[in-house]
Amino acid sequence: MTSPRTLYDKIWDDHVVDVQPDGSSLLYIDRHLVHEVTSPQAFEGLRVAGRKVRHPEKTLAVVDHNVQTSDRSQGIDDPESRTQLEALAENVRDFGIEFYDALDRRQGIVHIIGPEQGFTLPGQTIVCGDSHTSTHGAFGALAHGIGTSEVEHVLATQTLVQRKARNMRVSVDGTLPPGVTAKDIILAIIGEIGTAGGTGHVIEYAGEAIRALSMEGRMTICNMSIEGGARAGMVAPDATTFAYVKDRPKAPKGAAFDAARRYWESLVTDAGAHFDREVRLDAANLPPIVSWGTSPEDVISVQGRIPDPSEIADENKRQSKEKALAYMGLTPGTRITDITLDRIFIGSCTNGRIEDLREVARVVGDRKVHEGVSAMIVPGSGLVKAQAEAEGLDKILKAAGFDWREPGCSMCLGMNPDKLRPGERCASTSNRNFEGRQGPRGRTHLVSPAMAAAAAVAGRFVDIREWPQG
C-alpha cells in the first residue's frame, strides 16, 4: 500500500522518466509554450547541433512581450523587439511549430492563450521560458518557468532534469467579503509569507474560498506563486475545471474527454498526505489590498496607512523599506486613500481575462475617468477582446475615457512602447511592482481590477467596498 500523496506528488510521479544518482529526476514534459523573448538562442542551439524539435505538436508559440498594443499595421519601431519577433516567426516556420502571430485573432499573452485553447490540461507538466508559467497550475497541472538553455533542452528532448521541491499548502478558509477578489487573496498570501516564503516549495492552494473561485480567479492566484518564492502553484481540478476545459479547441473530445476526466478526478491530495509547510488564512478577514513599496510583499489594506520603517528592528529590512518609500515618493503614515494616481493599467497574465474586464465595466458603469488620469485596458488575448466587444464592454469603457488596446503584455513590463514616464504613479492589475518594472522610475501599485477601475474614476485609491453601485 502506497503512502498518502499530495497533488504535486502524483503529477511528479506520473512524469518521472529516470532518477539520477545525484537525486535529480528526468521528467517528461507534456506541453511547452514559447514566446519571442526567451526562445531565439534556444532555436539557434538546435540549428548549431543539427537537431529537430522532438515533439512540435506539443509546443505552441505566440508573440506577446514585445508586440505593440496600438495600431499593429505600423510595425515595430524598436529594432531589438522587431528582431525578436522576426526570429520567432522564422524559427517556428523552420521547426514546424504552431504559431499565433500579431495578426492572428488567437494571439495573446502566452499564459492566457494556453488555457483558452485547451492546450493546458489537468495533470500535465507544462513549461515556458517565463516566470509566470505557474498560472497553468490553476488546472491541477505542474507548471513552472524555465531558462533559455532549458527551453532548448525541452525542444530537443521533450524532457527536463529537475529536483523535486517540497510540498506546501496554503488554505484559505471561509467566504470572501463583497469587493474582495482572487487578486486580494494572493497579495494577502504574499504579504503573510513574504517573497521568500515559498522558496523550495510547490504550493497547493486549498480551502473553501479557493474552491469557490472561477478558473479565472484560480489562474490569478497561481500566477503570482513565483512572487511568493514558490517553484509553482496549483489547485486540484474539480467540476469547475472540467467545465472550463470541455469543448476547448485542443481539449480531448467525446470518449477521450470522459477517459481524461476519470484520470483528472484522481488528482487530489490524499487524506493524511504530508506537507512540509502549512499556512492558513481566513477569507472573511481579508480586505481589498494595495501594494505600497517595490516588492509584492509590501502590501496593506486599502484602509491602512503607509508603514513606518523605523519601527522595523532588522537593519537590512529597515533600510530596504526606507529605500522603497523613497523610490515610491511616499511618507510613513499617509493614508492609502490619500494617494493620487497618474496612470491606470488593467491587463496582464494576472488580470487580463474576460471576467476581469466584466468587473471593470461593472464598477465604471456610466462614470468617467478622472481628469488628469490616463487609463488603459489591454485584453489578454484577441479572443478575450472579441468577447468583450461582443458583450459591449468596450463601448462602456471607451465612453468612460479608457484607452482600449490590442492584446499583449503591454505595461506589465517595460519591453514595449507601453511604459510609465519617470515619476508617474500607476495602479496596475499586473504582478510585479519592482523598481522600473513598468518604465524607468515609474511607481507601481498592485491592485485588483475592481480597485483599479474605481481608482481610474476617483483619481486616487478608494475602498471598493464603499463604491456606489450603478
Swiss-Prot record:
CDD domains: IPMI. Its EC number is 4.2.1.33. Binds 1 [4Fe-4S] cluster per subunit. One of its GO terms (molecular function) is 4 iron, 4 sulfur cluster binding. Its cofactor is [4Fe-4S] cluster. Keywords: 4Fe-4S, Amino-acid biosynthesis, Branched-chain amino acid biosynthesis, Iron, Iron-sulfur, Leucine biosynthesis, Lyase, Metal-binding. It comes from the Bacteria. [4Fe-4S] cluster binds at C349, C409, C412. Pathway: Amino-acid biosynthesis; L-leucine biosynthesis; L-leucine from 3-methyl-2-oxobutanoate: step 2/4. InterPro entries: 3-IsopropMal_deHydase_lsu, Acnase/IPM_dHydase_lsu_aba_1/3, Acoase/IPM_deHydtase_lsu_aba, Aconitase_4Fe-4S_BS, Aconitase_4Fe-4S_dom, IPM_dehydratase_rel_enz, IPMI_cat. It is an enzyme of class 4 (lyase). It catalyses: (2R,3S)-3-isopropylmalate = (2S)-2-isopropylmalate. Coiled coil: none annotated. GO terms for biological process: L-leucine biosynthetic process. Belongs to the aconitase/IPM isomerase family. LeuC type 1 subfamily. Heterodimer of LeuC and LeuD. PANTHER family: 3-ISOPROPYLMALATE DEHYDRATASE, HOMOACONITASE, MITOCHONDRIAL-RELATED. Catalyzes the isomerization between 2-isopropylmalate and 3-isopropylmalate, via the formation of 2-isopropylmaleate. This is 3-isopropylmalate dehydratase large subunit. The lineage of its organism: Bacteria, Pseudomonadati, Pseudomonadota, Alphaproteobacteria, Hyphomicrobiales.
